[in-house]
Amino acid sequence: MSLFFYYGDECPHCEKMMPLIDQLEKETDVKVERVEVWHNDENLHTLESIPEQKDCGGVPYLWNDVSRKGICGEATIEELKSWAGA
């Protein structure tokens, strides 16, 4: 797995991104691992260990472990496809 979507359960911006993540997976051959960080300290530690994430300061945060590209905040489907390399 190389594509990750870090989110918080009650995060309204994250909720807006969920359907776009689903759309990305349906329209391409990619799979995005969803990682909840507000109620899981281990997942939060994993997110905080990404050096490129330090300037973001929150969720949603999308991380491509192959290209080392991240997206901080909400994004369009076109931005997601570019980020995923799809």
Annotate each predicted stretch with a short phrase:
Residues 1-33:
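Local sequence-structure signature of Cys/Sec-based thiol-disulfide redox active-site neighborhoods
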Residues 11-14, 56, 72:
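Disulfide-bonded cysteines in secreted/extracellular proteins and peptides
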Residues 12-13, 41-42, 78:
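Short alpha-helical
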Residues 34-38:
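Residue-level recognition of beta-strand->loop/alpha-helix junctions
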